[in-house]
Amino acid sequence: MKKALFFVGCLVGFSAFAQDNAGYQLPPKNLADLVTAPPTPSVSVDSKGQWMLVSERNTSTTTIAELSQPELRLAGLRINPATSGPSRAVFINNLKLRRVAANATDVQVTGLPTNPQLSTVQWSPDETKVAFTNTTDSKIELYVLDINSAAARKVSDIALNAVLGVPYQWLSDSKSFIIRGIPASRGAAPEISRIPTGPTIQENLGTKAQAATFQDLLKNPSDEKQFEYYATSQAMKLGLDGSLQPIWNVGVIATSSPSPDGKYVLLETIHRPFSYLVTVNRFPSKVDIYETTGTFVKTQIDIPLLENVPWGPDAAPSGQRGHNWRNDAAATLYWVEARDGGDPKKKIAIRDVVLTSDAPFTGEPKEIYAAAFRFGGVTWGNDQTALFSERWYATRKTITKLVNPSSPANPVVLFDRSSEDRYNNPGSPELKKNQYGEYVLDITPTGDIYLTGQGASPEGDRPFVDLFNLATKQTKRLWRSEAPYFERPISILNAEKGLILTSRESQEEQPNYFIRNLNPAQKKGKKPAEPALTQVTFFPHPYPQWKGIQKQQLRYKRSDGVDLTATLLLPPGYKKEDGPLPSFLWAYPAEFKSAAAAGQVSGSPYQFNRISYWTGAAFATMGYAVLENASIPIVGEGDKEPNDTYVEQLVASAKAAIDEGVRLGVVDANRVGVGGHSYGAFMTANLLSNSNLFKAGIARSGAYNRTLTPFGFQNEQRTYWQAPDVYNKMSPFMNADKMKTPLLLIHGEADNNTGTFPIQSERYYNALKGMGATTKLVFLPYESHGYTAKESLLHMLHEMGGWLDKYVKNASAINTNTKTGKMSGEK
C-alpha cells in the first residue's frame, strides 16, 4: 500500500508548458495544497505564564489584487498612501485568549472590528491588557483588549502614522500611550506634476561615499515632498479614556520612546537634507528629550547625513549612535560613541564606548563601558549587574562581559568565543519584567541567571535550560531536549517550582505548547520520574496527507575533509528497493573562517516535517528525493578570504551531497536538479556554469553580475577594485558562454532587496539567450524579494515543477560511476 502511495506522487505530473503570458497557472494539487493550507496560529505568552494570546490568520498569503494597490517607494520604504502605513502587510484576522493550563479552552475576543486587519500587538506593562492596531481602507486605529473580560474596544478615532515603524508605545502606568498620530494640519497630499522642473543633479567633491546598492531611494524633489508628507506625524500622549496631550510639534518622527518611569519621551526626528544615495535610516536626525507633559528638556544631538560611513560589517558611524533608555533605571539615557571614527581599518585600543546620562540630563555623561571591538548590545539587570557584548566580524569574535554599571572599572569576561562556533554557544539569558514593566535579567538570590539556547551538538540541535552563576562562571544543566522530540524552552513560568513553557514537536507531530515540570514529585525510594508534561495547545497537522514524508539527517565529508550535512526528504511510501529517484538539491551558501565551524551540525532530525512551498522540500510530494538545506560552506581560514576559492568549494560541496545520496541508493546521479533563492540563486547559476553535476537549475531572485554590487555583497568585504578577479570569477554573467544546462530564472518585478535588482535577472537572461542557452525568465508582477500573493506562489510552483519534470525527472540516462558520483564529462 505504501508503495502504491509513493507512485501516486510520482505519476502526478505537469501538463505541457503553457504559452508565454497565458496568465497565472496552477500547479498540481499536491503543491497547491501546501500554499492554501491553513496557517498555524501564533502565540504570545505573558511574562507571568498565566495567559496566552492566540493570533489567527485566514491565510498565509496575500492576493495579487492586494499587492496591486497604490504603493509609494520612497527612501527605502514601501508606503500605503491611503493609510500612511507599510504596504504589503499580512494581517492577523482574529484573536483568542487561553489560560496557560491543562484542559483550558479558547476564549473568543469580543469587540473586534468588522473584517479585522490587526498588527503590532503589545502587552501592557502590567499585562492586564493588550494593545493592537487595526488597518482600515483609509487609516490605522488603536485598539485595547482587556484580558479579564476578553473584550476589545477602539481607544480613539485618531489615525496613526506607521510609515516609520510601530506607531505607539505603552507608558509604564498601563493607562496611556505615546502615539505618532497624523495631525489635521498635514492637509492634502502634494500634487506631483509629471512635468519636471529641471534635471536631477548629484555631486561629490572628492570625498569617499561607499554604499550598498540600496533600492527604492529618493530620486528627485517630488519624491522628497511625498516622503516628507507621508512620514509626517505628531507625538502625543493618548489615554485609555481617549484624552490627548500633544508632546511635540509636527515633523518626521522616527522614534518616540517613553522612559521606563513614563516621565520622559525620547524623540528622534528626521530632517533635511535628504539623500538620493542612502535610505531613511541614514538621513539627518535630531535626538531630543521631552517630558510627557510636552515640556522640552534637551537636545541630545543633531546627527548629520550619514553618506560617508566607512565600509564593511565592522564599520560604524562616527559620533553618537544607538540612543535608548536603560531598562533597569527610571530615566537614564544611554548611547554609543565610536572612538575610531567608525573605521575598522584604524589600529586603536578602544573602538566604542557606552555613555549614560541620568534625568534631568544636566550633568556630564558617565562612561560605563569601553569596547576593544564593536559594541554588540547590552542586557540590563540592575544597578550592579549588566551584560555587555562586543563583536568583530573579520575574526568572528564575540565577547560577553559582566559589568557593574555603578562601578564599571573592572568588567569580567564571561564568554569569549567565535560567533561561528554553535557548539559552544552558551545561550541567551532569560528575562523578567521589573517594576516599570521593562524586561531585565532574571537574577536569582544566589547570583545565578538562566540561559536557554538551541544546543547545537554533533547529534543535532538539542535545546536546553542552564543555570549560570555570574560569580563562579559555573554552569548547571537543568534540562535538555531528548530524542525522538525536538523541544525548545519558550519561557520560565515558575523557577521555584521548576515549571517552564516549551514548544514540542517530532517529525510527524505539529509543534504545540507544553508545561514541563523539571522537578516532578517522586515516590520515596524511587528514581526520579521523567519530568511531567502538560499539553496546553492542540494545533492540528497543517497537511495530514503528507504525514508519510520520510526525513533523515545526512552527514558526509567534502573532498577536502570538511564535514557537511543535509536533510534528505523522501516521498511517502518510498522503499529503497524502489531504486534511486530523480532528485532536487536546495541550498544557500555560507562563509566561514574555520573549517571546524563550517562542519558543525545544524538543525535536528526530530523537527516537524514542515513541507514548505517556499523551498525544495515541496517536491518530495511530487516523487523527488530532496536534499534540503545541503550545507555549502565557503571557508577562508587565517588571512585567506572565503570567496577566493568560492567556485571550487561550491562545486565540491554539491558533488559531496550528490555522492552521499547515490551511496544511500536514493539519488539518481543522472537526474539531479539544483535550486535556490537570492544568494542560493547565485549559487545555482554558478554550479551550472562550472560543473556537469546537474540536469537543470532554478534560480529565484538572484544577482548574477557582481560588478553591479561593487562595494561588497553578502559577506564579501572587499570592493570590486580591490578584488576584480574574484568579482568576475564569481559572476555567472561573466560565464554565460559556459552555460549548457537548462536554467529557469524567476524574479519579483518589484524586488527591493539590496543587490538583487530585477535587472540582474533580465540582463542575465539576455546574455544566456544570446549565447544559445536553454533558459526561461519569469517576472512576477508586484512581487518583492519574497513572494506573497497566492497567485504568484501557485504560478511559481507551476513553473518550478514543470521545469524539473521536463529536464530532470524525464531526462535521458547517461553512464555514471555510482561509487564516486562523478558524471561523464565533469569539469
Q: What residues fall within each predicted segment?
A:
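Short hydrophobic segments within beta-strands
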Residues: L569, W586-A587, G675, I746
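Active-site-proximal cap/loop segments of hydrolase catalytic domains
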Residues: F91-K96, V100, Q600-K827
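N-terminal signal peptide c-region/cleavage motif recognized by signal peptidases
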Residues: G13-S15
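Short beta-strand element of the alpha/beta-hydrolase
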Residues: L570, D578-A590
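Positively charged n-region of N-terminal signal peptides that target proteins for export
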Residues: M1-A4
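Conserved hydrophobic/aromatic pocket- or pore-lining residues that grip, position, or stack substrates
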Residues: V287, L333, L414, Y513, ...
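Beta-propeller folds
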Residues: A18-I549, D563, G599-Q600, K809-K827
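Serine-hydrolase catalytic-loop signature spanning alpha/beta hydrolases and amidase-signature enzymes
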Residues: E591-K593, V626
